[in-house]
């Protein structure tokens, strides 16, 4: 499966934005420069200025019509993003979806090595790819510091995965002996939640400082998982 011409342009724009981000060390400047290069003003008479939702966290939104291939675009975006990061950064991705139905579909698609989306990711990362459901993460099923260091790790989760109002969501914040090996995993101490055990899944994910792919940004509900990767 190949990218269509407009999808190629989208990925090209993403790559250019990442280049500008490294060059200028300013999200808003990179954003404005990208649009200016296209002959589009940023401000009152043009595109709205960059809006910061999370301080220091670059955000990119692909606006794609229904059937426009947003999932394939997301799959093609992972490599350019990590290529722009220091190589020591763990290659971890939270693939966040809005509903259980989409969760099941996305997990099935990404774990199917014959599917075009998974094939693309495998090619980009030399077949060193692990896809995890929430239950697999909670169980520590092939999820450990060695695996995370050696592979691209994709966590397919829903908003409900972190809602403390739901019993299943609270599991992500509970002490978890299966994730004990991650206690020794180096991290930015400022990324951890207070009053939450260090072995909790939410703490492990925050340590990894993942890239977050949001499926359908219109319905995103912010949770405590609000420190996606700083590029």
Locations of regions flagged by a protein language model:
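RecA-like P-loop NTPase motor core of helicase/translocase proteins
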Residues: 1-231
């Amino acid at each position: 499966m190949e990218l269509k011409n407009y999808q190629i342009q989208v990925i090209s724009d993403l790559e250019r934005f990442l280049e500008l981000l490294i060059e200028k060390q300013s999200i808003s400047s990179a954003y404005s420069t990208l649009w200016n290069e296209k002959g589009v003003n940023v401000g009152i008479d043009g595109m709205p200025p960059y809006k910061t939702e999370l301080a220091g966290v670059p955000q990119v939104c692909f606006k794609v019509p229904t059937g426009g291939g947003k999932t394939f675009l997301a799959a093609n975006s992972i490599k350019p993003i990590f290529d722009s990061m220091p190589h020591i950064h763990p290659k971890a991705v939270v693939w966040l979806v809005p509903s259980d139905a989409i969760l099941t579909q996305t997990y099935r698609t990404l774990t199917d090595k014959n599917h075009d989306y998974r094939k693309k990711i495998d090619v980009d990362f030399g077949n060193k790819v692990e896809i995890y459901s929430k239950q697999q993460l909670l169980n520590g099923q092939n999820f450990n510091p060695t695996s995370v260091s050696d592979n691209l790790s994709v966590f397919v989760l829903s908003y409900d995965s972190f809602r403390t109002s739901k019993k299943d969501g609270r599991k992500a914040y509970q002490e978890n002996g299966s994730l004990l090996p991650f206690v020794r995993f180096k991290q930015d101490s400022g990324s951890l939640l207070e009053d939450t055990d260090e072995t909790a899944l939410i703490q492990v994910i925050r340590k990894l400082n993942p890239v977050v792919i949001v499926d359908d940004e219109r319905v995103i509900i912010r949770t405590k998982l609000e420190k996606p990767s700083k590029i």
